[in-house]
Structures are given as structure tokens and as C-alpha cells.
Amino acid sequence: MKPPPDTAHSGAGIHQPMTHDEAVIWAEGMVPALVSRASEAEQLRELPQATIDEVTASGAFRLLVPSDLGGWGLGLRSITEMTRAMAHGCMSSAWTISFLMLHNWFVARGPKVLQDDLWAERPYVVMPCPLAPTGTATPVSGGYNMTGRWQWATGVQHADWVMVNTLVVRDGDPESRYCLAPLSDVTVDDVWHTSGM
């Protein structure tokens, strides 16, 4: 399922970002809900939609997005402390939520054209990022043609986009490159059958 529309705005339509302390308090406040949904998350093998809805409504996916681009402008210390707090409710949910928040940090460090594409509708994206370079990307006009199979795409069920590590071969030498694609351009195989994650 896709994340719900972003509702983390005041009545005037201006987002009110959280400070570091407010973000940690929000994460601590998520603990009872995460405890109550831990069994459901285990059975579903993904975050319950109610959890995604709460994170989206809070604006927390904006955590690492720079404030001048519509985010909270917080740093890695904040996401670490928030993740630690949420883990008291459900470690696997805290892991997944933090992964989905973290990948906006990569976008924030990318070129403006990337930010414009991914943040066109809202100033964050929900995106997994498998790290192993198990696919290839061939340069084509306007981008790359990617092919491969990537595993462990944490949170892909709720994603808009995916970011994958690929091998780009130029002049016979493979180079590791991160490439992005809309979720609509990939096939998701439901192969995640594990416990405790």
C-alpha cells in the first residue's frame, strides 16, 4: 500500500517541523501503538497500514530533509534516538520506519534534478534501498536501463520509489552506482518469509 496523503500541515497549509527533542518525544509516544501492533506486523511481514498512516500524519518522513526544501532539517543523531525510542515498542517496526526516513538523506545530498523529481508532490519520498549491487545498469539517453534482482527492500510495500545499487560497466570496468526508479517500473516479488524482522 502507498502512504496516505501528507497531512502534517497546520491550518494555513504550512508544515510545522519538530525540533530534535519534539521528534524524540513523538517517537516515544509511538511506543504503545507499536507494542499493540507488533503481532500484526509479524503476521503481515510488513508495517501495518495504521503505523504508516501515523508516521505520515506526523510528518516524520521529513526528518532528514533540509528545512529549506520543506523538511525538518534534523540529523543522524535525531534518527538514531528516534529509532532507539520506537524500538521499545517494536524493533522491526522501528527498523523499517527509520530506513524509510533515512533514504531521504541520500536524496537531500543528490543533485537538484533528483530532488525535483522525487519531491515534486511532497518534500519526502518513501523508498527502500537494497545495498548489494545485484543488478546492472546500462547508460541510455536520459538515464540508465536497469535489470536485476535485488533483495531485502525494507518497506517496499509502502514505497513510491526504489533506490538500488547497480553495476555500471564502462570501458570494461564495473562501477557501483545507486539508481532510482518509480515503484511502478519494478516488479515486487513477495519472498520475505522470516520471523522477528
Please give the residue ranges for each predicted region.
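A short core secondary-structure module
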Residues: R149-D190
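Alpha-helical interface subdomain recognition
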Residues: K2-E81
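Beta-strand-enriched cores of mature, soluble protein domains
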Residues: G142-Y144, R170, G196
